[in-house]
């Protein structure tokens, strides 16, 4: 049974690579634009695959439009990938926006901002004269 899971994982990794190639080179839909395939989760019976993608866009409406275009083009992408992979059953593709990368970047920026603010506060505290010391002109 563990072998079955490793097979689905291997197929998911290969599917991720092939989809990334197909989306960059063979898909000419201008609505999709630049897309990154982050992960592919394949079901045990290989009938379905969830494809997690990110875009270089932050506007939620643009992201939804690109995701809708990808899901509309999913059968065509499936056909192109099926020609590149040797599987008896090619999973149906469902594209899902992966917000984890964006959230990770947002959290990293927040941590960096807090560190900068903390260092700025420490710098101001160190500049103040202590008791018994006077400022020299």
From Swiss-Prot:
Belongs to the RbfA family. InterPro entries: KH_dom-like_a/b, RbfA, RbfA_dom_sf. PANTHER family: RIBOSOME-BINDING FACTOR A, CHLOROPLASTIC-RELATED. Monomer. Binds 30S ribosomal subunits, but not 50S ribosomal subunits or 70S ribosomes. Gene3D superfamilies: 3.30.300.20. It comes from Shewanella amazonensis (strain ATCC BAA-1098 / SB2B). GO terms for cellular component: cytosol. It holds the Pfam family RBFA. It comes from the Bacteria. One of several proteins that assist in the late maturation steps of the functional core of the 30S ribosomal subunit. Associates with free 30S ribosomal subunits (but not with 30S subunits that are part of 70S ribosomes or polysomes). Required for efficient processing of 16S rRNA. May interact with the 5'-terminal helix region of 16S rRNA. GO terms for molecular function: ribosomal small subunit binding. This is Ribosome-binding factor A. NCBIfam families: rbfA (TIGR00082). Its main location: cytoplasm. The gene is rbfA. It is found in: Cytoplasm. Keywords: Cytoplasm, Ribosome biogenesis. One of its GO terms (biological process) is maturation of SSU-rRNA.
